[in-house]
Regions:
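Conserved ABC transporter NBD signature motif
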Residues: 71-88
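Conserved ABC ATPase "signature" region
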Residues: 115, 129-148
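Conserved ABC ATPase signature
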Residues: 152-156, 160
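Conserved catalytic motifs of ABC-family nucleotide-binding domains
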Residues: 173
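Catalytic Walker B motif of ABC-type/P-loop ATPase nucleotide-binding domains
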Residues: 177-181
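H-loop/switch region of ABC-family ATPase nucleotide-binding domains
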Residues: 213-214
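H-loop (His-switch) and adjacent beta-strand-loop-beta switch element
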Residues: 226-238
Length: 265
């Protein structure tokens, strides 16, 4: 859905994501406490922290699947609006962790998975089914999977499966991607290829990305900005300004792999 010129100007200055004094509890335990942060259009933000620090909890709260603590838990604003609304469905692409290899009895193809993403498209009600194939093919092209489009997902590598999930999100015409550990279960070449893809989406498509990763080296190479989360925000800035990269990497649940084949800014 096209935005008016006035709406585009307003969105250019309004952060895609605004979080104010956010606190979230799970099973009666406070996991996130008084977080404040903004994410602006076209930013690639990496979210790191030890296991149990609230990274996935934060993503689920942004998606509206978890609620702030009642009365005192702060707020989440998306595209200048209060909370996750129905109109946001097509604008936010959720990329969960791909997990283990798909069983052989699952016979769905890459193209069929990606076409599912078009069901959330903002323009579906305007253009109808005639644009479904075009959007799916465009998404496959963006992630480099055109030649795998008719392959069954059980035959994909970890990196190819993760690209398929990203393509499904892109097919919805999302302009804000939330990714939860997309590098898990992929080999080094696939990891670097995925990071290059995300970097290209930011620079060429002006995509906004918030990505959770336990791989501090990889996310530092790719992201414009790093947020280190442990209960609250302990660091928020460029990766080169991290106060002590080696000590952060030594915390539980974070890996720091030296690699000269990554890319960065």
């Amino acid at each position: 859905m096209e935005l008016s010129a006035a709406a585009e100007r307003r969105e250019s200055v309004t952060p895609v994501l605004q979080i104010r004094d956010l606190s979230v509890a799970r099973s009666g335990e406070v996991v996130i406490q008084e977080i404040n942060l903004d994410v602006r259009k076209g930013e690639f933000v990496g979210l790191v922290g030890p296991n149990g620090s609230g990274k996935t909890t934060l993503l689920l709260t942004i998606l509206g699947l978890l609620e702030p603590i009642p009365n005192t838990g702060g707020e989440v604003r998306l595209f200048g609006n209060d909370g996750f609304s129905k109109s946001d469905h097509g604008r936010i692409g959720w990329v969960p962790q791909a997990g283990s290899k798909i069983p052989n009895h699952i016979r769905i193809t890459v193209r069929e998975i990606v076409r599912l993403g078009t069901l959330n498209s903002r323009s579906l009600s305007v253009f109808g089914g005639s644009s479904i194939n075009l959007r799916a093919e465009r998404a496959l092209e963006m992630v480099g999977l055109v030649d795998k489009a008719d392959s069954e997902i059980s035959r994909l590598s970890g990196g190819e499966l993760q690209r398929t999930i990203i393509a499904r999100a892109l097919a919805s015409e999302a302009d804000f991607l939330l990714l939860d550990e997309p590098l898990v279960g992929v080999d080094l070449p696939s990891r670097n290829s995925l990071l290059k893809l995300l970097d290209d989406l930011c620079h060429q498509e002006n995509m906004t990305i918030l990505m959770v990763s336990h791989d501090l080296t990889a996310i530092s190479q790719a992201a414009h900005r790093i947020i280190y989360l442990e209960g609250g925000v302990r660091f928020d800035g460029p990766s080169e300004d991290l106060p002590d990269l080696s000590s952060l990497a030594g915390l539980r649940g974070i890996t720091h792999v030296h690699d000269d084949h990554g890319h960065g800014h």
